[in-house]
Amino acid sequence: EGAYVKEPITGLHKWVVSFDLNSLYPHLIMQYNLSPETLLKSKHQDITVDDMLKGIKLNIPDKTTMTPNGALFRTDKKGFLPTMMEELYNERVTYKKKMLSAQQEFENTKDNKYKKLISRYNNIQMARKISLNSAYGAIGNQYFRYYDKAIAEGITKSGQLSIRWIENRLNKYLNNILKTDDDYVIASDTDSVYLTMDKLVTKTIKSDNALSKTINFLDKVASESIEPYITKSYDEL
């Protein structure tokens, strides 16, 4: 199975905000320690994404992780694949920061030397991004030396769990605030969710002519309330 794509709630929606899971598949590889040499060959448990969403008690041995396809991975030793993902991700973060810094220097000085640095750092961080995103494709390629269907499926099923988990949690969060029982996630796709914040805006912003005020309000809610809540929710998962 591939990624989870929610059937969109059709119609015209006001005040839509989106939240992305940063480098989802590489982070899942790191989170579950997914690698050919960490995969346990014991019989996989009969488990589904729905079971995990319902909070069914899992029988997971010590020092192991289990993906939603029932595959087990040892955690007493870090696999080569998550190690590689971590190194590539850290390098990308470093060069992306350098690129942004060079962009700021160019804005301040208009010195063309920073244009070359911007291009160089951007090329490096994009190369790291492509390498990160290729890991899942490689592990799911039957002609790849380390091909393993259980690992590839473990990645996509874990992605399904992650996006559906946060969809449920965000709906719970907004319904609790607004005292409603609605579906505020109008769409989700692989690693992104789209929320309609119209009812929250209507309840909070009273002025008829408050476009900038509303945008600032939503920016603040997203950064100071929803993003920390998303982080906390994934810690619980």
Region locations from a protein language model:
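Conserved acidic
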Residues: 1-237
